[in-house]
Amino acid sequence: MAIKLAINGFGRIGRNIVRALYESGLSNEIKIVAINELADPEAIAHLLKYDTSHGRFFFPVKLGEDTISVAGDAIALFCEPNPAELPWKTLGVDVVLECTGVYHSREHAQLHLTAGAKKVLFSHPADNDVDATIVYGINDDELKPEHTIVSNGSCTTNCVVPVIKVLDDAFGIESGAITTIHASMNDQPVIDAYHHDLRRTRAASQSIIPVDTKLARGIDRILPKFKGRFEAIAVRVPTINVTAMDLSVTVNTDVDLNAVNNALKAQAKDRLEGILSYTAEPLVSIDFNHDPHSCIIDGTQTRVSHKRLIKLLVWCDNEWGFANRMLDTARAMVALEKITNIK
């Protein structure tokens, strides 16, 4: 029986989830049964079909009366500001993918459960009162059947945490520092405009812009042993997609460049296949656009100083990679419930 998903908020991540589902060939196993979005339906259909970052969607999209169809699959379309009023029970929704970026607490997620959904998965970091924060491939084994409200973390935690885990397992990490070099986002203006963050009042295409980040806190949630041992800063750069992470860690044992790259390459072919990738080609950010991995190591940029300080450059498509992990985590949540029901 197919997994039934609903998407609340059809922005960058919501639309990429639908595209990723159909491009991955999983649309028979997973069905999007509903989308709730306050925007104009014609704009919803148009932006699903045509995307500046990811190109044209080659599955047919048609807008109907209160529906949007993809490859002939009808998806109910709602414009409901109150999630508690959505017909999730009638539609048999297994998991709501909460992609508005507005809701972040257990109280907010409860609105979807009240409407009849079985589970909720946030597409962004949530408050501490959720059942779990998951970075797929690292701690998804901590999911439990009784977990009804889960966060998928952020694109940056999904990018950096697998790398930290590999390095710690191989060499033992003492501490670390990270600079996120992030593509522009939709909270930045095209030309100077008002914003509560004075740096984000400035035109996105004209500056490298420092922004606040809670990445270090996100690492603590996934890997509690590192609480207080990582610091992070972030800047936004004038590109529209693909992010780079400048990761520096000090380790407990002497290492060299080859040992570091070999450890990462080995895990990319083993336990973290599909999550972690490795390249030694002379690539630039656009080359990682539409890459489904959570993180891609640029082996040409690995550096080791005084045998114990490692510096890495890690790439990710902050939209496409994360959208794929949303599908992975949603599948895992439903699979656990089905196993429990069989027992």
From Swiss-Prot:
Molecular-function GO term, any one: NADP binding
EC number: 1.2.1.72
GO annotations of cellular component type: cytoplasm
Gene Ontology biological-process entries: glucose metabolic process; pyridoxal phosphate biosynthetic process; pyridoxine biosynthetic process
Subcellular location: Cytoplasm
Residues annotated as binding NAD(+): R12, I13, N318
Tagged with keyword Oxidoreductase: yes
Entry keyword NAD: yes
Gene3D superfamilies, A to Z: Dihydrodipicolinate Reductase, domain 2, NAD(P)-binding Rossmann-like Domain
Active-site positions on this chain: C155
Chief site of localization: cytoplasm
Binding positions (substrate): S154, C155, T156, R200, T213, K214, R236
Intrachain S-S bonds: none
Alphabetized UniProt keyword annotations: Cytoplasm, NAD, Oxidoreductase, Pyridoxine biosynthesis
Broadest EC class assigned to this enzyme: oxidoreductase
A matching Pfam family: Gp_dh_C
Site-annotated residues for Activates thiol group during catalysis: H182
Pathway the protein takes part in: Cofactor biosynthesis; pyridoxine 5'-phosphate biosynthesis; pyridoxine 5'-phosphate from D-erythrose 4-phosphate: step 1/5
Catalytic activity: D-erythrose 4-phosphate + NAD(+) + H2O = 4-phospho-D-erythronate + NADH + 2 H(+)
Protein origin, superkingdom: Bacteria
Family: Belongs to the glyceraldehyde-3-phosphate dehydrogenase family. Epd subfamily.
NCBIfam families (alphabetical): E4PD_g-proteo, GAPDH-I, PRK13535.1
Job description of the protein: Catalyzes the NAD-dependent conversion of D-erythrose 4-phosphate to 4-phosphoerythronate.
Protein name: D-erythrose-4-phosphate dehydrogenase
Gene (name only): epd
